[in-house]
Amino acid sequence: MKATHPVLFREVQRFRDVWWVMVLVFGIAALQWWLLLAQLLSGRPVGDNPAPTAILLLYWLLFGVGLPVFFLLLRLEVEVTPNTVLIRYAPLFTRQIAKNEIAGVEPLTYGPLREFGGWGIRGWGGRVAYNVRGNQGVELTLRDGRRVLIGSNDPAALAAALAAARGEPAPATAAPSPAIPPSGS
């Protein structure tokens, strides 16, 4: 990302750093490779209801090659400048939020499965989340009432950069999300 303004905060998170996602992705890929090679090398269709070789090649391209490459390239980049918050879920899309659109900033601990149904780009209950892993982030409340949660490995630094961009004092450290009851209750 090229910035014309000084960068107050920048973080890059990659799905390839989440071991269980990579085990799943490469397990699916390995199965596709095995099916294709078994059918091509033996010259006989694999299984009781085999797919034609052309269909197997298509599946191999999509899941044996495409899926691993996609997950190796997939990353969440967050950049805060004095004027904007840039959220890039590469290679899918980029979202830019101007600082004057932001009404509030709150670092929090959230439940990605319970509140959003998982990780990635998720919309749930009038909120949208951009996250890769973990349960820490910063929620932006926009002037139109929409809420945007940005997952972060360093929510305090992200919140401080957002506050600095808006000319406000840094918010307190991450608090539990309202959807997660405090421990001990």
Explain the meaning of each model-derived region.
Residues 19-24, 45-51, 78-92, 147:
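Short N-terminal helix-initiation segments at or just after the protein's N-terminus
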Residues 5, 12, 87-153, 177-185:
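Non-transmembrane, membrane-adjacent beta-strand/coil modules in membrane-associated proteins
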Residues 22-42, 54-60, 92-102, 167-171:
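Short, charge-rich amphipathic segments
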